[in-house]
Each structure stands twice: as structure tokens, then as C-alpha cells.
């Protein structure tokens, strides 16, 4: 079960139309309102069907705890399917909701909105630190266990030999410091490095199960970026116009950087023959679970990276040593991995994701090491420009012992470059196709880590795919292959930005996205209708994404809503601005919580400031109607 708990000034709803699964209700349930209440948006999930009574008991406990914290005795239970992509049957959902209502009714004033009805609702969130909380409730024994395919009525998932080997591979864990020393994890003092401590614990435990929703899940919805898609498989998302804009800007930026770096953009198929002899061998060397489908009596799998298509393309190419290093990139929309259901959450871990995947063919190991260094620096620069800095992630370096003994300087320089301790994983035996790889790992508010950028040195696949180049003597040779994702999955970049903002909010900072990624860069708020024409004039002087809040609301509410949307620049237009020709601008990046920073400048000065901030980055136009009164609500 998923709960979203909102401490509300008031919550009111009105039923509009019933769905095919709507419960029968009396007239009194067709509308409702509670003031000074805790609103519990609730999604009952399929896993709750095994023991509805346990789900009721745990939900009641969580709701009571929060009600005590916010000091309210009024509770509105509101069924909300959008909180989960794995819902229970309607019958069980109603049973659980009624059970929660009955259990709470003895101590609280409780109202329950009906299940299965389209409803108009308004909720006014109080906005204090405890006013927006989420809880994930799992029956005993399910939170940390993967769902077995046969139990879910699915085909047995395809699991590679490499993934099986990963579960049994013996790793030696060390901390590498910038001075080149390797330290035992158990004896190294991680106290000054709390995020590295969390990352080490996460990696060594290998527990990926989701126990509750991380903060970015609520943020991606409230900012109308993305949400779960109940009509698809778990781990497949929908992206609203604002989210599509952010996602496309990130995609375009990474492609621009890669092509400037010398990569050629290509496009390859989404599915491949599982029994193709070359591909089958590679499947068994890649640690991932695959989606499989049948087509024309052939068993196909959906790609989990661009390797397959690019390597098959490389096989058919005529390549000279003069062409090396040869780089190709594809923005894979989508790549697919059949991640275990219990590990899926928000944008952190998905089954369908967008991966920039670059491969570099190198003449020999010396050239591969040189390219590896360059691409390590490239990844740092890419994340820096996205808004994810060196201090925001932890570095993991993984290698075989033989490779390390021959390339210590390369490995140590990676720690020197970031100037902080890094986690090392070393193997005596090579289980995979690579001898060296690194990842930049973002550690979120729940101490869960997710890999972003990565580069790997691959010593197998040129042979496997029969990829060769003609050397200076006219003879065929095998290249060394680098795999690089300059940013990691695009969805994970959004996840990291949202999680970073959530953690900064807890530290008292004002959250925001980088200006170049903000769906609205400037919001103009006219005080009254007579100021609307001047607001339009100002908007035409701004060469950026600017919208106008023309709704019939108070100025205070308009400004607050702009703040909740993280708009970087908010311009209030009144008589003074019309008379003087300057504008009053709230600058979010310079503001503190409850202490906005304001400047009085001309529209031309504001435009120059924004153009400077977004210089060198991709640009797209406003994704929604310019006037807020013309916009629909997505969440």
C-alpha cells in the first residue's frame, strides 16, 4: 500500500462520474469536506491482497502516528490510484479502505471519499515540514523479496550467466584515497564522509529493495514532470509536457557534447534474436535481466543497451587504424531491463529508460587507457553542467587484480581528480567482459545509491562480434572497446536533481532546477487585469520560456504557486512598473526560505542575465500555454 499524507487547511471533493468499478454509495458520500484535517491519499496494491487485515493494521498505525505529529483528530481517506502502478483488485481496495475507516472512527472524525468515481477535489496543504509525507506499507516478508515470475503469472524471466556470476563473485572491497593508498573498508574512518559511508553500506549489502518512496516521487508529480503509468508494466513511466521538456533538453545536451567529442550518432533496433549465436554469448556476459517476446516463432529480447546494434554495425564496417579512436553514440529511447518488482521506484530504478550509450573502438590498450582518462573527465563535465557536482556523488572503481597491478597510476589518478576517497571493488577472476570500469553514484535521501555516468574497458566483444580494423601493415587486428554513458540514464539525472533539491530543502535552502532545465524560466504576475497588456509587452522582450499568470487569484497565491513550481524568476507587474518601465523580480537562486531576494531591473537586463545563464545549452520553447488560465491540470 502507498500513502501520501497531507496536513490540510481543508480538503473537499465532489463526485462527477462513476467508473465501471465504482462502489455503490449513498447521497451523503457524493461530496465531502473536512477542515484542519490529515488527508490520506491511498493506493491499495496487489501485494496487500494476501493479507488485507495486516495492510489495514499497518496503515492505521502510520496514519495515527502522523495525525499525532501534526496534532489533528480529523482524517480524510481518499483513494488515489496514481500512487502505484501495481494496484489490487477493486474488491480488496474497498475492503481495505472501509477497514481503515472503521478502525480510525473510534478515535477520529473520519470521512472517506468513494472508490471508483471521478471526483473534483481541492486540497489546501499547510506547507510546514510535516505537511507532506509519504509511506510505503509492505506485508511481512515482501518488502525485501523479489516477486517470483510464476507467482505473478508471468513467463520465467531471462537471466544472464553474468548476473548469476555476479551473485557468487568474490569481491575485495577497499577505500582508495587520493594519495594512492588502498585501505581496508573495515578499518578506514568513514565518519568525515557520510555519503561515502552510505554508499559503501549500500554496495556491500547488495540490498536493492524499496522500503518507502523517496522524496523525488512526490516532487516529480507535484512539479507535473512524470508519474507511474498504471496501463503499462511496472517501471514504465508517463511524462507530462514539463517532464518531456526537461528530458528532451538533457537528451539533446548529452548528444551535443558527445558529437563535439567526436562521436557519430546512429540508431539501432529495439529487439534482437535471442538465439543469434553472437548475441547469445554477449547476453551471458552482461549482468542484466531481459524482457523476452515471441515474433514469427523466434524468441526475441528487448535491448538493455545500444551495444548489440552498434557492435553488429561495427562488424559490417571497413575500419582503418587511421579512423581510430572511432566513436558512435545512440540515445536509446528506450532500453529495457526486467528489474525485480520490489526494487522499482519512481525515476530511480525503471524497466524502460533512456540511455545515452557511446562506444569507442581503440587501436590498443594504450589508446584505450588514454581514451578512458578523457572520458572520465568528460563525464565529470557533463554532470557538472547538468547541475550534479563532484560533491553530489560517490565514485566506484571496479577492476581485476591483474589490470590494477599494471595500471595503478591510472586508477590512483581517478581518485586524485575528484580529490576524495573512492570505493574500490577488485576481483581475482574476470567474471564480465570488462577489466576496468567506474561509475558516479548518487546517494539519495533514503541512503540508496544509483549509478549515473560510467565508462568500461571491454576486452571481449571485438572478438565476439568479429570486429576488426586494418593496421598500418595492412593486417586485420581486434580493437579494444570502451563503453561510455556520459550522464547515465536521463531519468536518473532528473531523479538526482530532484533528490538533491529535496535534501537541500531539509538544510534550509530553496530548491530549484538549473535555469536551462526549468520548464518556466520567468513567470509574470500582473496585479490586476489592467496590467495584463504591459505584462504581455514585457514577455515579448524576454527571449526565454516565459508565461503569464492571468488567473483570478490573489497576488500572494500566484507568487506562492510560482514558488511551489520552482520558477527561477518571478516578475510582479503593477502601476509602478508600468510608470517606470522597470520590473520587480524575485530571484530564486539568491533567495532563502521565507526570505525572497528581489531586484528592480529592466526587462532587457533580465533577458541578458538569463541568456548568460543558459548560454551553450539546448533550448526549447514553453511546453504549455503561455497563459496559465488556458492550462489543464495533469496532477
From Swiss-Prot:
BP-aspect Gene Ontology terms: threonyl-tRNA aminoacylation
This protein's UniProt keywords: Aminoacyl-tRNA synthetase, ATP-binding, Cytoplasm, Ligase, Metal-binding, Nucleotide-binding, Protein biosynthesis, RNA-binding, tRNA-binding, Zinc
Subcellular location: Cytoplasm
EC code(s) of this entry: 6.1.1.3
GO MF annotation, one: zinc ion binding
A cellular component term, taken from the record's GO annotations: cytoplasm
Cofactor note: Binds 1 zinc ion per subunit.
Co-factor requirement: Zn(2+)
InterPro entries referenced in this protein's UniProt entry, alphabetically: aa-tRNA-synt_IIb, aa-tRNA-synth_II, aa-tRNA-synth_II/BPL/LPL, Anticodon-bd, Anticodon-bd_dom_sf, DTD-like_sf, Thr-tRNA-ligase_IIa, Threonyl-tRNA_syn_edit_dom_arc
Source organism superkingdom: Archaea
Record region (Catalytic): 215-514
Gene3D superfamilies xrefs: Anticodon-binding domain, Bira Bifunctional Protein, Domain 2, D-tyrosyl-tRNA(Tyr) deacylase
Function noted in UniProt: Catalyzes the attachment of threonine to tRNA(Thr) in a two-step reaction: L-threonine is first activated by ATP to form Thr-AMP and then transferred to the acceptor end of tRNA(Thr). Also edits incorrectly charged L-seryl-tRNA(Thr).
Subunit structure, as described in the record: Homodimer.
HAMAP family listed in its UniProt record: Thr_tRNA_synth (MF_00184)
Domain comment, as recorded: The N-terminal domain is an archaea-specific tRNA-editing domain that hydrolyzes incorrectly charged L-seryl-tRNA(Thr). Catalysis of tRNA editing is performed by the charged tRNA itself.
Record's protein name: Threonine--tRNA ligase
